[in-house]
Amino acid sequence: MENERAKQVYLAKLNEQAERYDEMVEAMKKVAALDVELTIEERNLLSVGYKNVIGARRASWRILSSIEQKEESKGNEQNAKRIKDYRTKVEEELSKICYDILAVIDKHLVPFATSGESTVFYYKMKGDYFRYLAEFKSGADREEAADLSLKAYEAATSSASTELSTTHPIRLGLALNFSVFYYEILNSPERACHLAKRAFDEAIAELDSLNEDSYKDSTLIMQLLRDNLTLWTSDLEEGGEQSKGHNQQDEN
């Protein structure tokens, strides 16, 4: 088992360097299927692989949606229909990737997580991938994805508040993504600002005790929290018109 594990981790690293993220994900899924607690390195390889696989499709979907709206506003119905068909294909790919990693998390990762850090990491991932589903789903499907995302983020936050320091990069990354969820998915800039500001302020208060190893990661996420706060606060001051241009940043 250890030989197989080492082999798949090596292949994942190789595919990351070659920017072959689909193969990177497949290698790390084989490691996860061994039903053992992943090391920090393995956990990060799995996360990076999926982030890149999903990130490319999310970017495609946003571009297609924007072009589709422009074609509709010009009255070019035939072009809009072509784009919609293509966007639907991208949505099918997005759904497949999201449900794939969510199944891996529930079946192979959460049951074998023994540390608070791992538990927070995996529930944050669940929140993220249900959020990605909510980005393009509609009606009852969107409502369900949003509800499951909220529950996962809440579980991660509950665990993080007792298990991780306020400056821990995973706790900060969770606050960053959870606040984006409130802003983009639940259309609640007030709650988004409150969550982001609280996380930022709590981390600032403990900055002197920041672990040297994670200093760069933590301060980068704090900067993203502050950038989002600046954007969202200006939106609120301008009468609540939300920035739907996806200028706000999450960890991806």
UniProtKB/Swiss-Prot annotation:
Key words of the record: Cytoplasm, Nucleus, Phosphoprotein
* Pfam families per the UniProt record, alphabetical: 14-3-3 (PF00244)
Q: Where is the major localization of this protein?
A: nucleus
UniProt function note: Is associated with a DNA binding complex that binds to the G box, a well-characterized cis-acting DNA regulatory element found in plant genes.
- What is the source species? Arabidopsis thaliana
What protein does this entry describe?
A: 14-3-3-like protein GF14 omicron
Spell out which residues are annotated as carrying Phosphoserine: 65, 188
Q: Does the keyword rRNA processing apply?
A: no
Source organism lineage? Eukaryota, Viridiplantae, Streptophyta, Embryophyta, Tracheophyta
In which compartments does the protein localize?
Nucleus; Cytoplasm
* GO molecular function terms noted in the UniProt entry: ATPase binding
TM stretches of this protein: none
Q: Which family does it belong to?
A: Belongs to the 14-3-3 family.
